[in-house]
Regions:
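Short, flexible loop/turn elements at secondary-structure junctions
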Residues: 383-385, 398, 448, 452, ...
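Carbohydrate-active enzyme catalytic cores, enriched for enzymes
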Residues: 239, 243-422, 471-472, 476-478, ...
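Glycine-rich phosphate/pyrophosphate-binding beta-alpha loops
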Residues: 396-409, 427-432, 490-494
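Active-site rim segments in enzyme catalytic domains, especially the processed small/beta chain
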Residues: 408-473
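Short alpha-helical hairpin
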Residues: 39-59, 72
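Acidic, contiguous internal or C-terminal segments within carbohydrate-active enzymes
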Residues: 477, 482-510
Length: 510
């Protein structure tokens, strides 16, 4: 038995989406038409559409970028096809989605959960594979549930297909239950958060599945652990990257969305910590909009505070979050995140009313101008919450928490007059090539370097050499000056100290 919508409610919801958000409807149908032809934009393809196969060649990596294979096997385009069916009633979209999902189940087989000695083999699910545990989790929470709910009542969803899908869902759950805890025993990575969301969503969607109750209980326990391990007392996500922080706000929020739908409770300490995470998202936003792009962060194109606001609106049904985001971002930015979640939001008309009101009455933040995130060794500083204000961010935390960090101890990002003045390079690619090496190196950051050397060895996209101690030594705020002092020993015997000082609310001295 699957917990799904029926066809009438799917079409009713789709009709309201078409009425309230016609431009988003058109975008979804455009993407669906491209997917019908096997044409997608994926990592490594640039901004251009790329033919992935018809059906897709799931296991190939034609552009030599591992993220291409990962993203293709997350099946976002099948979710889009299912949404296009819900918007139009056109069964060709449903048929295409089910044909491709069926093809994947038939031809992309999971590695064994066990090694030759009969022990669980987590490394089988931690490499370039459609069955990497993260992709298992993302299919579980982000794409398969909506594909199933939107298409389960169509003629395409045959008993034969349902049986093979059911078996694959069981395997997904077993991997997430047995393997993921071995990959992330400390629960201290965003992957583990998504993997447990996948386990939660699938166990809720298939309540009569053997071990469903066990899987659900495990997911709730581990999501609590994720919040405890990944969110610092100051509200920041431990990886120290604003993009991943905003992503985690979205993922932590989805637990509340699923809990409301399936009548589950979430501990109060979890929801209160999530609200603190949104405040951190606001601090991590430049005065002129966009993330302070520390580490593997994007600036403005995705995973900004707009995503965190959309997520918290879905979690708490409070317009405050959307109103705050619209102070920094144009409505189009929020709409990109809203479009991806329209089928998770029950009251579309109410959302439309809130967005219309928020556009005309955004909320300017009423928060401190200085935020020293001591657990992350990060500092956010601005002269006001005006968009023309001086705003800067600096950080110094070595050894790094994980490899989304760059080789940039004591670096900084600075904006003023509504413009970026000194930028952190942000993320460019995950592909292990010269671009990745440059974008992570000290030489492409606003850092002090010694003897033309990196602060520590860059071994590859996901490998560094050892690092030495580095931290924010002090932050002092007076009537005329705020000074931030960072310190690290990565150039021993030299010791590196940097002072960033905001003077008279008018200029910055380095």
């Amino acid at each position: 038995m699957i917990y799904t919508n029926n066809r009438e409610s799917v079409f009713a919801h789709g009709a309201v989406i078409r009425e309230c958000f016609p431009e988003l409807t058109d975008q979804t149908i455009k993407l669906a038409e491209e997917a019908m032809k096997g044409m997608l934009v994926l990592p490594g393809t640039g901004p251009e559409l790329y033919f992935v196969g018809n059906p897709p060649k799931w296991t190939e990596n034609p552009v030599n970028d591992n993220e291409y294979t990962f993203h293709l096997n997350r099946m976002h385009h099948l979710k889009t096809l299912a949404e296009a069916y819900g918007l139009t009633g056109n069964l060709t979209y449903a048929q295409k989605a089910i044909e491709e999902l069926s093809d994947w189940i038939d031809h992309v087989h999971a590695p064994s959960l066990y090694d030759e000695q009969g022990n669980l083999a987590p490394l089988h699910f931690d490499g370039l594979s459609p069955w990497r545990a993260l992709e298992v989790g993302i299919r579980g929470y982000r794409t398969w549930p909506l594909i199933i709910e939107l298409l389960a009542d169509t003629p395409c969803f045959t008993e034969e297909f349902q049986q093979k899908l059911y078996q694959s869902v069981q395997l997904h759950c077993k991997i997430l239950y047995e393997i993921s805890p071995l990959l992330w025993p400390k629960a201290d990575h965003n992957h583990y958060l998504m993997e447990n969301l996948g386990l939660m969503a699938l166990s809720c969607l298939f309540p009569e599945m053997p071990d469903s109750a066990k899987y659900l209980a495990h997911s709730q326990q581990e999501l609590d652990r994720c919040m405890e391990a990944q969110c610092t007392p100051c509200g920041g996500q431990i990886e120290g990257s604003p993009s991943y922080h905003n992503g985690c706000v979205f993922w932590f929020s989805l637990r509340l969305v699923f809990a409301r739908k399936f009548h589950l409770t979430v501990p109060e300490h979890y929801t209160e910590q999530l609200k603190k995470m949104f405040i951190h998202s606001v601090h991590a936003t430049r005065a002129c909009g966009g993330n302070f792009p520390w580490g593997d962060s994007h600036i403005a194109e995705k995973e900004t505070m707009a995503l965190a606001a959309t997520a918290c609106y879905m979690a708490f049904e409070d317009p405050f979050y959307l109103q705050t985001a619209l102070y920094f971002y144009p409505p189009k930015t929020l709409m990109n995140d809203i479009r991806d979640n329209l089928w998770r939001i029950p009251d579309i008309r109410h959302l439309k009313e809130i967005m219309d009101d928020a556009v005309t009455a955004p909320i300017r933040p009423d928060l401190p101008l200085l935020a020293w995130q001591k657990d992350l060794n990060q500092v956010y500083l601005r002269t006001s919450w005006d968009k023309e204000a001086i705003s800067l961010m600096t950080a110094c935390r070595t050894p790094v928490q994980n490899l989304h960090a760059h080789i940039d101890a004591g670096g900084f990002d600075l904006t003023a007059f509504g413009e970026t003045l000194v930028t952190d390079p942000a993320i460019y690619t995950y592909k292990d090539d010269e671009n990745r090496r440059h974008f992570k190196s000290s030489f492409w950051h606003n850092c002090l370097t010694v003897n033309w050397k990196n602060m520590w060895e860059y071994k590859g996209s996901w490998a560094y050499g050892p690092q030495k101690e580095g931290y924010i030594r002090s932050v002092t705020a007076g009537d005329r000056m705020t000074a931030i002092i960072s310190f690290h020993k990565n150039y021993e015997p030299a010791e590196t100290t940097r002072i960033l000082a905001l003077i008279d609310q008018q200029f910055v001295i380095v």
